């Protein structure tokens, strides 16, 4: 889900006060960066365990050609990407934000913040609808890729102002298609509808390690 910061809020922040000035963890360790074609402009923020999980999901994303291409294009944008854990990312467990300037659509781009719930299980916190109107998986890696797709276009100035969610889902579906092929599984195309939380049954206790109860309550 995209959340563009209000212009009046951004105007009150100097460029040096944006999120990238706080203590961050690089996506790759120094030795790893030499061999990686992506990630030099990506920083993470969270507990050590959350950093491990974010790195794992990004590694899974990079193992798919579409995912690797997205990460390479994010690096070549020349802007910074900050990914932080947030237990309050309730709509599909992620949201992407950038300064609300014309650079988002004029080919220049902006630096971007992704807030993502790094505590969700690998299987994901939500499901999404296929074009056959069936609920299908929305794993943590697929969810994070969706946010990276938003970031890709914001950072390259190719963001569709009135159709940003459709744009990200188009990218996500190509990622899903390639992922399904690599896993030798059937491909299910996602439609342009927000995710549906995976909620506990009446007899089950909510899993508070990833704010399941809060996510489900917010959906009602």
Please tell me what each predicted stretch does:
Residues 1-4:
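Positively charged n-region of N-terminal signal peptides that target proteins for export
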Residues 28, 46, 87, 118-120, ...:
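A mature extracytoplasmic/lumenal domain signature
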Residues 59-66, 149-157, 173-180:
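Sec-exported extracytoplasmic/periplasmic mature domains
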Residues 144:
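An amphipathic, basic-hydrophobic helix/alpha-beta surface used to engage anionic
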């Amino acid at each position: 889900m995209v959340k563009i910061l209000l212009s009046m809020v951004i105007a009150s922040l100097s460029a040096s006060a944006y999120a990238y000035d706080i203590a961050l963890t690089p996506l790759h360790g120094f030795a790893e960066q030499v061999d990686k074609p992506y990630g030099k402009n990506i920083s993470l923020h969270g507990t050590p365990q959350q950093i491990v999980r974010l790195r794992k999901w990004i590694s899974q994303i990079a193992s798919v050609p579409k995912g690797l291409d997205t990460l390479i294009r994010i690096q070549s944008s020349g802007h910074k990407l900050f990914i932080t854990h947030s237990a309050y990312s309730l709509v599909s467990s992620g949201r992407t934000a950038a300064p609300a300037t014309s650079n988002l659509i004029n080919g220049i781009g902006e630096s971007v913040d992704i807030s993502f719930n790094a505590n969700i299980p690998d299987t994901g916190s939500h499901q999404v609808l296929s074009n056959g109107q069936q609920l299908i998986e929305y794993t943590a890696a697929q969810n994070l890729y969706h946010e990276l797709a938003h970031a890709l276009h914001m950072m390259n100035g190719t963001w569709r102002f009135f159709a940003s969610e459709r744009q990200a889902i188009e990218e996500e579906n190509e990622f899903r298609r390639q992922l399904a092929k690599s896993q030798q599984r059937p491909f299910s195309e996602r439609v342009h509808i927000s995710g549906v939380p995976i909620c506990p049954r009446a007899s089950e206790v909510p899993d508070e390690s990833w704010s399941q109860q809060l996510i489900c309550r917010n959906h009602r």
